[in-house]
Amino acid sequence: MVQPQLTRDSMIGPYPLPPVDDALRAQARAQPGQWLDFLDPMIDPATPNPPAFAVQGGYRADELGQIVEYSINPRYEPSELRAGFRCSSAFELTLWRALHGFNTVGMLADAFASATLLAYVDHPGAEDLPAVPDPDQPGTSLLLVCSSWTFCSWENAVEVTGSFLLGLTSNTDAVLIINPGTGLSLRLAARTMMSLARTPHQQHQ
């Protein structure tokens, strides 16, 4: 489960770049004053001037060939080879980035609020979204949503916006489960998601 006290700048995914090892230090000594970039696996590492979206990040070597800085690309767009699927929406891409250490949880919350999602309903034509009891935490209600049909395992779902879900759960202790049971799953209290999301007005400040 995601740890509670989160801020907009919190990272919930692992550090995405390879660790600095002897081979990387040797490469830095051989390329002083340059960035050592790590590209998407679909891109040939020897490609000159690769597109920015294909760069995962990198380390910078100073003039003495010492690694002194790193950079993680928050706009990295993983290929299907890297992600294991093709992202079908801006939210799905941001969710993948957040879970893999490229985007902050604040960026995720903003994307969730503006996303169109699939929410679980218990029968065709239902309009009310059922709160599912958490089998592991009695007394906790779960709200099940998916980022797309790619990750949806139930037949009955309705399209809703993330902002609608946040408004619906603002005064509850409901927990959001995004893409339950998949490799792109996240569990987060709805109240936490709402507190981290900026309104469109705030996003321009």
Each language-model region and where it sits:
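An interfacial alpha-helical scaffold signature
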Residues: V2-Q205
